[in-house]
């Protein structure tokens, strides 16, 4: 039993599954990202389990017995509580699009794992005896921080894997193997739907090392295809430095960084002309309207932004110096709310657009008065 296998086998979540499957097979494996994350020391709460030695009809009957929910059209994966339970399979491309695959049952561990995208996602751990299967060198690549594809032909069958490589590089801070990067440069993502592209972009936007993923988007020529941008190498490298710093220092909201920071900066520095065609969640539209400065904003400009929100909620508050200044101005946690009497403005006879203009004039005056006082 391997060390990591022993640890996984002790997981209490797996006991019921072992007891349930024991009369039928002892060849059930934790697969994919579960093994990868466990080996990276991450806590595993959801399990992908591939079950061998049971024919499809019997497997369907067993899944019906526990009330598992089947998903998929070509080949069922069953969801039950925090488990994805499936039979091993091979996949062969038969046409255009991500659904044009011929799927077949494959009761062979090596053959079934060949369909995986990267070596680090092709490792397997038996839930009964903890044995560790690694046919393609995933453990070695994991230790070296390398994303390496398994098979040229299989990898090229789904161009989404190019974007998966980008988001994995950003989440794990891994480099893409030279041969894999060369293959990816030959693959077009034009067959992908906007929905599938955005699914991977959202993972990139939430990653810790977004600058790594950004540079791979540049190297793969995807900045133009996705965002309509044509950047020089110098521009890309300088932006990556800015992005790395911004993501590091951006205050967390509800325990996590705002996933819109990537696009906020990209649009601010270069102008993403196809922004509204990207099909991203509605919440992203607000980030193009957020104040952006390519230079150091003044205290007056910070107070003006704080009229609308506490600066901890501003996407541009992404450096230690800005955070310190916001706190000194007293607008990090709270808005700047000068005492402006709207009723008095109306009483003075202001109407229509003049009302807003007068409010803004008084706000500007309040900002000047605030700046004339010592910092709090």
Where are the predicted features?
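Catalytic cores of the polymerase beta-like nucleotidyltransferase superfamily
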Residues: 1-376
